[in-house]
């Protein structure tokens, strides 16, 4: 599984950073540790003497965490963020993005630039493409947010697939401007498999002639318009950002 922490670990390695302050649950820093990067948390020795502050999923974040992060940045650490999305969909409905709120507080105090490692970062899309051994234009990005997944796909020339089981409904997708409009609107995640299955038959032709992808997408968009008629709303859980 590839997560924002996977991209963060790769980024920190490329930057030559050996030690990071992690604002997040214990699992947030695991990918960093697996990559040989030492992680520390608020209250531990040397928490403000690090090369990077990495902000991830941290529901229990307190003012001491924010203060420690700010001190580390004032000491020269760079700011790395897993997600800058203000809201996302869960079983309970719309939920705030903790890392977005935490990062906003840190940046308000420090005015530090940030490096985003999750969606819609082109860095994340590039990492996935490299891991899979394919160009970014061969990827499909699936999601429920026009300013996250669709924007990410557009930045890398990938196919953007929208679902209506999260924060954006079918009618809202149709009203999006061209820059945030998906290539296809799917009622639920299970339809992704059939979409990819249909597209897979054309894979050799697309691989041989990359420039024909736009024509292929237009054809798929027309076919998907019929399959994506509004359906009764279903409550579903999407993978967290």
Feature annotation, model-predicted:
Residues 2, 6-224, 229-241:
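Asp-based, Mg2+/Mn2+-dependent phosphohydrolase catalytic module
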